[in-house]
Amino acid sequence: MFRTISNFMRVAEIRRKILFTLAMLIVFRIGTFIPVPHTNAEVLKVQDQANVLGMLNVFGGGALQHFSIFAVGITPYITASIIVQLLQMDVIPKFSEWAKQGEMGRKKSAQFIRYFTIILAFIQAIGMSYGFNNIAGGQLITDQSWTTYLFIATVLTAGTAFLLWLGEQITANGVGNGISMIIFAGLVAAIPNVANQIYLQQFQNAGDQLFMHIIKIVLIGLVILAIVVGVIYIQQAVRKIPIQYAKAVSGNNQYQGAKNTHLPLKVNSAGVIPVIFASAFLMTPRTIAQLFPDSSISKWLVANLDFAHPIGMTLYVGLIVAFTYFYAFIQVNPEQMAENLKKQNGYVPGIRPGKATEQYVTKILYRLTFIGAIFLGAISILPLVFTKIATLPPSAQIGGTSLLIIVGVALETMKTLESQLVKRHYKGFIKKVN
C-alpha cells in the first residue's frame, strides 16, 4: 500500500492532481467557517441536533452550524440533477434529445443544471434564512429587514455557485468526481464531532455502566468494519459476460478477429450516487417542514421522515432501490452495448447479435442491480437500526449513510488513481473480485 502511495507521488501529473484536489478541499473547509454577514450563528450551535439542522450540518461538514457562506451546500445541484435526468426519460422532448446527442448533449444538460441550481439555491437560501431564524427564536438574523434577507440569500447562493465551480475544477483538474469529493470532505470533517457526542453520551458519567458502554462501542466498531468490507466487496464485484469475435473473410483470405474477451458488468453500477440522492431527497421535505414549525403537517413530516422512523426508513430504502436501478441504466446502456458489439463482429456465445444481445444484457443487469440495490438499502439502514437499539446520539443516525458514502467515494477515487498508474506501468493495490 505504502509503495503504491509512493508511486502516486512519483508521477508528476498524478501528484499535481492530488495536490490540486487537496487545495480545493482546503478552500472548501475554510469557507465552512466564514459566517454570513448580519447573522449570529452561535444560536444554532445550541439547537437540538436531532432535528433536520443536525442532519444537514453533518452533510455540510459543519457549514450550517456556523451559518457560513456554504450553508446551503450543493443540495440544490443534486436536486437539479435528479429533475433534469428524470425529464430526459422521454418526459420533455428537448431534454430527451439532449440525452441522445452525446458529448454536445451532455454539455447542454450540464449548463441547464447550473442555471437551475442557482435558482433552487436562491429559493432554498431564502427559506433557510427565514426558517432557521424562526427556529432560533428570531435571534439568527440581526437585522430583520427584507433587504437583509435578500442580501443573505444572495451570499448563500453565491456560496453554492462557488462550491459548484470548485467541484467542476476538481473533476477537470483533480482526482475523481468533484461534487462527490466535496460531499466526502464534508462528511469526513463531521466525524470528530459525531465521535465526541458518542463519547460524551457513553463515557461521561458512565459510572457502573462503563463496561456495558465499552461493549457497545466495540459492537459499533464491528458494524463499521462490516460496512467497510461489504462496500468494498460489492463495489468491486462484477459479472463477466464472455464475448467472442468472428473471423473476417475477404475473398480467399481469412482474418482472425479480435482476441476473445469478456464484458464486465458491475453488481452495483450506480456506485454510491443512489445513497447521496436518496438522503438529499428525503431531507428536502423535512427542511421545508422546519420552516413552518406550528403546522400540523410540518410536525408530522419532521417526526415521520426521520431516518430512524419506520416510515422514513422505508422511504429511504425505497428511494435507494429506485435510484440504484435508475442510475444503473444510465451508466450501462444495453442497447448501445449490443450495437457496438455488432459493429465489431462481436457476440455473446449462444446469443444472436443485435436485439437478442440487448435483451440478454438487460436481463443480467436487472438481476445484478437487484442484488446491488438490496445491499445498499440493507447496509444503509443497518447502522440506523443499531443506533436506535444502542440509544446512540441522534447525530449518529446519519453516520451509517456517511460511512457508506465515504467508503464508496474513497474506493472510486483509488480506482481512478490506479488507472492512472496502470497507464504508466505501475502496480496498484486494488485487487479484482471475480
Annotate each language-model stretch with its function.
Residues 1-97, 101-434:
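N-terminal cationic and glycine-rich segments that engage phosphates or anionic surfaces
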